[in-house]
Amino acid sequence: MNVGILHPGDMGVTVGLCLQRCGHEVSWLSRDRSEAPRARAEAFTDYDDLTTLCGQSDVIFSVCPPDAAYSVAQQVHQANFSGTFVDANAVAPSTAEKIAALFDDNYVDGGIIGPPARQPGSTRLYLCGERALSVAAMLEGADLQAIVMQGNTSAASALKMAYAAYTKGSSALLLAVNGLAEAAGVTETLQQEWQLSQPGLMQRSEKTALATSRKAWRFAGEMREIAKTFEAHGLPGQFHSGAAQLYELMASLKTLPPASLSEVVQVLLQASAEPTPDIESDSLRD
């Protein structure tokens, strides 16, 4: 089948490569993209026009930052795409339902759990919707394991929100705790107490800083979607709204090498002392 990928970052590229290895023709939209994504997507057919890409594609996978998910879906809808639209983004079920309304039965809800799919068993793509089984069949034997869920049209998004609420939410909390300790002048004593009562937490803090520093700008939108999900079910969403704010403070680390814990803490404290900028997703250019 002919598959379009919008817009392949680290995760989207591996989704495309998995589909390609399963025998599908994969294309992407190169318009307005920088050299880095062009290099990542060099194995795919390059289109400069979305309408042309949509006309050539049987299936489109949307794999982009959450802030851009609905906009990308609207653009595909406006290009009169008539095939299967797979939204594999980290969005709230309410956002997924809005996207589903654009495509009716041609919509498949997806949620990716795990790192970029470069080895078997590492990454799952949960799917639900009328065409979920046919999409899963496209990835049979791939490093990206497709799992079809029962439930409503946004069940995969709900699962992703619940999963990331802990993984990325707890990462934000841990970084915030380290920032608080530094600001209050108790870092050394806190670390000593951790060695006594929470062994391994210092090492986890260091690993969390390295793993999140370059991706924090992207996580901010995901935290806002998670907050919406909690609130939609009558649960407090303020924790994840706070996590979004913390990740936004780290946005300046996006283009730098992975940062150490001390570097992240200094960025947090410096950024928190300045007026908060109006950060918009630059997802379709990176």
Regions found by a protein language model. Give the residues of each.
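NAD(P)+-binding Rossmann beta1-loop-alpha1 motif at the extreme N-terminus of oxidoreductases
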Residues: 1-59
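Glycine- and other small-residue-rich loops at beta-strand/loop junctions that grip anionic moieties
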Residues: 8, 62, 88-89, 150-151, ...
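Rossmann-fold NAD(P) dinucleotide-binding segment
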Residues: 50-107
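NAD(P)-dependent dehydrogenase/reductase Rossmann-like domain
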Residues: 248-286
